């Protein structure tokens, strides 16, 4: 069993428990009371080329399977506020509990604290989780190609859009890129971390980005430790980077985000973009 298989087994168990507590109709009622989802796709890749650069998705992340405990984060809302003040375009919130120490309550707290779009980062295997995401205020949801059969991927992308949210479709191989595009993914995240082995290789993004059309938002996930990495991913064609561990382990998350944002907006970055 791979790490991903193990995570998914736990996700399904926890999902069954939540379904027993809250019906789908109750979730739908909560979701319909939410204000409309924000347009994350448009913010990550503005139509005006002068406003593009490389955007930053800053993550609230307590633990990871590869590194264990990263940060306690007693107040995720306060951390998200610092990210927003630093210039993050989107705030990502881990909601998987067993391996990442997250929760839907973290998502709710962050949604109430910031004005920028919020991403629910979890292992989605069922449309119930999309309704959960909308009910707790998410504007974006992560869909991992490696965790889904093609029919399910297509269905979940369609449901995400019907709820007004943006689907961030995560890939790690050329085959997964093809599957994502066949499913009409419009925002594709290339995870430089192999979810089956947890190894990181920043060359993964450079290898796969050319397979993703220009009209699709390209996001580099994992492997960002500083501004230099932002420039390297820009050179490979990134529209945005998703950063978690570096930020939660640092002493000044606002400054750390601001440094990455500044690197992404620098004229030199525009010059190196393909």
Swiss-Prot record:
Pathway: Amino-acid biosynthesis; L-tryptophan biosynthesis; L-tryptophan from chorismate: step 4/5
Its EC number(s): 4.1.1.48
CDD domains: IGPS
Family annotation (HAMAP family): IGPS_A, IGPS_B
Protein name: Indole-3-glycerol phosphate synthase
Organism lineage string: Bacteria, Bacillati, Actinomycetota, Actinomycetes, Kineosporiales
Catalytic EC class: lyase
UniProt organism field: Kineococcus radiotolerans (strain ATCC BAA-149 / DSM 14245 / SRS30216)
Domain of life: Bacteria
GO biological process: L-tryptophan biosynthetic process
Catalysed transformations (reactions): 1-(2-carboxyphenylamino)-1-deoxy-D-ribulose 5-phosphate + H(+) = (1S,2R)-1-C-(indol-3-yl)glycerol 3-phosphate + CO2 + H2O
Family according to the record: Belongs to the TrpC family.
Gene Ontology molecular-function annotations: indole-3-glycerol-phosphate synthase activity; phosphoribosylanthranilate isomerase activity
Keywords for the protein's UniProt record, in alphabetical order: Amino-acid biosynthesis, Aromatic amino acid biosynthesis, Decarboxylase, Lyase, Tryptophan biosynthesis
Name of the gene encoding the protein in the UniProt record: trpC
